[in-house]
Structures are given as C-alpha cells and as structure tokens.
Amino acid sequence: MPEVDAIRAQLFALQDKEYQIFNSRLMPTLPSETVIGVRVPLLRKLAKQLADTPEAEVFLQELPHFYYEENALHAFLLEPVRDYGTALAETERFLPYVDNWAVCDSFSPKVFAQHKLELLAAIRRWLGSDRTYTVRYGIGMLMRYYLDDAFRPEYLAWAAAVHSEDYYVNMMRAWYFATALAKQSAAALPWLTEKRLDVWTHNKTIQKAVESYRISPEQKQALRALRIRSQKLCEERRV
C-alpha cells in the first residue's frame, strides 16, 4: 500500500546506522535486518505527526509489520486513542504481533488509566495467553496501574500464578514483584519471606529490588538475607 510505503520511507529517513547496531544487540530475539535504527523520541514524534491521519489508519490495519520500528510506531499510535473500547480492541488485535520486549513495554493507551476496573478482565485474559509478550504485557499493566490506589493483594497472586519457562515472562514477573516491594511492601514481602515464588523469580526479584533507588538500605539488607542459594535448599525449607 502506498500509505504504508510512505511511512516506511519516513522511518528510513530517520535511520541512524550506529544506533541500529546498538539497538539490535538489545533485542536479541529480533533478526538485525528487521531493525532500521530509529531512536524512540523520533518514533514518538512521528507518531504524533501521523495521529488521526488517513495514512495512520491504513498503517494500523496493515499487520503484521516487518520492521521493529513499524511495530513501535504502531504501539505509539494506539496511545492517544480516546475511546476505551476502541483502544482495547486495537491493543488486543496488535498484541499477537508483538515479538520483543521493547515494543511490549513501551506503550499503554492513556484511556486505560480511566477504566481500571474494566481493564482487569482483559488483563486476566492476557495473563492466560500462550504468547510470551501478551503475558508480559498483562503483567506490565498490573505493574503500571494496580500498585498504587487501585492495588489489591490478590493481584500479586495473579502474577505469581503465571507459570512459564520464558525468560521475558519471568523477568517481568520479577520486575513486578520488585516494584510491589517498593510500593506495597506489607503485601509483597511475604511472597519472599514465605518463599511462595519459584527460585529464579524469587532471586531475580531481590536482585531488582536491591538495584532500585526506591528501596531503603535497611530493606535491601533484609532482602539480601532472603536469597535462596539453590533449588535443593528451597525444597528443604518447604518440607
């Protein structure tokens, strides 16, 4: 389609070849030839320029995209959608095509913040998906919207109930629990003291929390003492 070709040409006009090499290394799940090399601020600027244009409407219908930057641009074009139903439907249509952490973690339609109660049903669906980045996105939405005033302790159980061997899913689970330790410590800490998480997520949560500026030195010291040294030790402690 000429509209899609025109947008692709705009992306290549913004290409930085040195950045392409750097960015490709950050996304090892993507073939390097699918990364153009456009910096995120420029992608967001282009998304603002294209928002609500006929060209953008055509582009959003053209899935799958080939380039990482096309997927990132697609994600950024969804953020200003004002109608909740449309934003949710378009997000769910797009998620099966998200194939890397950078796009997955980069977007959330702003209207989601005004519909937290309704969004929970979608999050439950996403957490139950067999697609890596759909699950990761669901956990990310729990982290973004439900660790402050909308927090409920059962949401921790939702994230913990996700069972996956995928690194990108489990890393997001750890990130979620580390953030929960900073924002909802009383509810989150028992998940570590009682060793309710798998060993990898348990230890990675502690690592990320210790790296966080939002965790006090005293909390970090206590968390370090909770590290599990081996799978065998964890099993012995649960007997």
What spans do the regions from the language model cover?
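Alpha-helical scaffold domains
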Residues: 1-239
